[in-house]
């Protein structure tokens, strides 16, 4: 039990590293004051541009992957689950930023990348297919998440892994609740729209 608690804390701390926020600070910009207010790749793209967004996404993937690897290495199968889930939660709710972070898509993808790289790639492809006609990045994120969940159930993955991927999807969908309402209303921001200062 002590090992699980330790890797869960480690996962949270890794996940809570606010890469997007730090990228903005390097340029004197607080990304939380623009667009959606999130610190993840999409809002960084709209606020700081493509290169900052690419770096942010890669680092966010790396956080999840490293947390999952260390969790499994130190505490086995359930260590992978605990560290992976807490990395995702840490990204969305970082203590350093008063629990206002990103939306956990890239970090969750990094977690699942450890054991299911093909499923993650298929999820990315499914997400891209959703983005191309709509230009709604949020819809692509939701589609990708669901695609990975479905694949793990079709693959008959271990129960612990299926529980993890469902939990990660729940985090992603909760964090995208406002996006889903805007999608339903047809008012969601489309890819290419620059972030505006928040009121």
From Swiss-Prot:
It holds the Pfam family G3P_acyltransf. GO terms for molecular function: acyl-phosphate glycerol-3-phosphate acyltransferase activity. It catalyses: an acyl phosphate + sn-glycerol 3-phosphate = a 1-acyl-sn-glycero-3-phosphate + phosphate. It is found in: Cell membrane. GO terms for cellular component: plasma membrane. The keyword Cell membrane applies. Its main location: membrane. SMART domains: G3P_acyltransf. The keyword RNA-binding does not apply. It is a multi-pass membrane protein. Its EC number is 2.3.1.275. It is an enzyme of class 2 (transferase). The chain crosses the membrane at residues 4-24, 51-71, 77-97, 111-131, 152-172. Pathway: Lipid metabolism; phospholipid metabolism. Keywords: Cell membrane, Lipid biosynthesis, Lipid metabolism, Membrane, Phospholipid biosynthesis, Phospholipid metabolism, Transferase, Transmembrane, Transmembrane helix. InterPro entries: G3P_acylTferase_PlsY. GO terms for biological process: phospholipid biosynthetic process. Probably interacts with PlsX. Belongs to the PlsY family. Catalyzes the transfer of an acyl group from acyl-phosphate (acyl-PO(4)) to glycerol-3-phosphate (G3P) to form lysophosphatidic acid (LPA). This enzyme utilizes acyl-phosphate as fatty acyl donor, but not acyl-CoA or acyl-ACP. This is Glycerol-3-phosphate acyltransferase. It comes from Symbiobacterium thermophilum (strain DSM 24528 / JCM 14929 / IAM 14863 / T). The gene is plsY.
């Amino acid at each position: 039990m002590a090992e699980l608690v330790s890797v869960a804390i480690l996962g949270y701390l890794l996940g809570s590293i606010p890469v997007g926020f730090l990228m903005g600070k390097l340029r004197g910009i607080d990304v939380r004051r623009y667009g959606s207010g999130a610190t993840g790749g999409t809002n960084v793209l709209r606020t700081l541009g493509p290169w900052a967004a690419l770096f942010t996404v890669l680092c966010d993937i790396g956080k999840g992957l490293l947390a999952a690897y260390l969790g499994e290495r130190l505490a086995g199968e359930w260590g992978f689950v605990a560290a992976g889930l807490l990395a995702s939660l840490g990204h969305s709710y970082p203590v350093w930023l008063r629990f206002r972070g990103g939306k956990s898509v890239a970090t969750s993808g990094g977690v699942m990348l450890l054991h299911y790289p093909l499923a993650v790639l298929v999820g990315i492809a499914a997400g891209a297919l959703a983005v191309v006609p709509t230009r709604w990045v949020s819809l692509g994120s939701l589609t990708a998440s669901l695609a990975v969940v479905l694949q793990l159930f079709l693959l008959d993955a271990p129960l612990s892994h299926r529980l993890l991927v469902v939990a990660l999807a729940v985090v992603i969908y909760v964090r995208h609740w406002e996006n889903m309402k805007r999608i339903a209303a047809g008012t969601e921001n489309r890819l290419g729209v620059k972030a505006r200062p928040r009121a």
